[in-house]
Amino acid sequence: MALLKEKFASLPEFLRGPVLACIKNPEADPFFRNAPHLLVVHAKEGAVTPTEDCVAACAYFDILMQGCGYGTTWCGFLKMIVDAVPEAIDLLGLPRGTPFYAMLFGRPDVTYLRIPPR
């Protein structure tokens, strides 16, 4: 969060609101929604379709976790933050310019009733 505070003026307008909420209330978590786990998928250097590889891996992980009773959400905010502040990728331990995407997952707090199969 310190890096985002430092780079606040250079952030795109749509990221300033959530960052400001975190600055005003350190308990707020508009980016990760208090999810217990973060999965970061990245492509190898030299991959033919690195972005598509990351999306496909996340899609399969999403299906797998749903089948195991976990809730998932795609974490586009992390990608937007790294796009706006490239040095933030260092916090993930990835080389700069590495294609990646992230997902949050954990046991859901709520359950949804579904209509029965027909």
Per-segment meaning from a language model:
Residues 37-89, 103:
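Small-aliphatic-rich amphipathic alpha-helix that forms the alpha element of a beta-alpha
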